[in-house]
């Protein structure tokens, strides 16, 4: 009787709810239930999601703008800005031993096709610094833009990709909405085949048959 009573309570209080009817061991019922549970994970994840903006969004671009107050009221996302200079301080504070350890990991995981190892090393330091700052502030998503790199030597390209691999959401050119959605979908899809990642639209391969 518990499920029916619980359903009645939701109906009586006019609460938004999902009703799934069927035998609990049937594959179609389990699939619908699993889909609902993943949506619930996304909703719960959203309520405590913090997004770190390194600087502002790209200038003269409207699509990356948004109402940060409204999105916190409706979805729970806390979207705030940290100075790029703060990130630079964290980068400068990364120990050489930490960088050496991450460079060893990168060399084992990737085929580094460049003699500009110092550039890769800087990306390693940036990854360590960004992760440290994100974790310190409890943020699971971040954004940045090439127009706001005060004191940084490079745009954190490899560092951003690596952080996405570790479950953080990311959006380019200050697009905090995309970074937050990427983090939410990553949480919803945990344990499934495939993955979720941010990709610039001009990198798509739309060749017929090879999309």
Regions found by a protein language model. Name each.
Residues 1-211:
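An N-terminal assembly and electron-transfer interface module characteristic of large anaerobic redox
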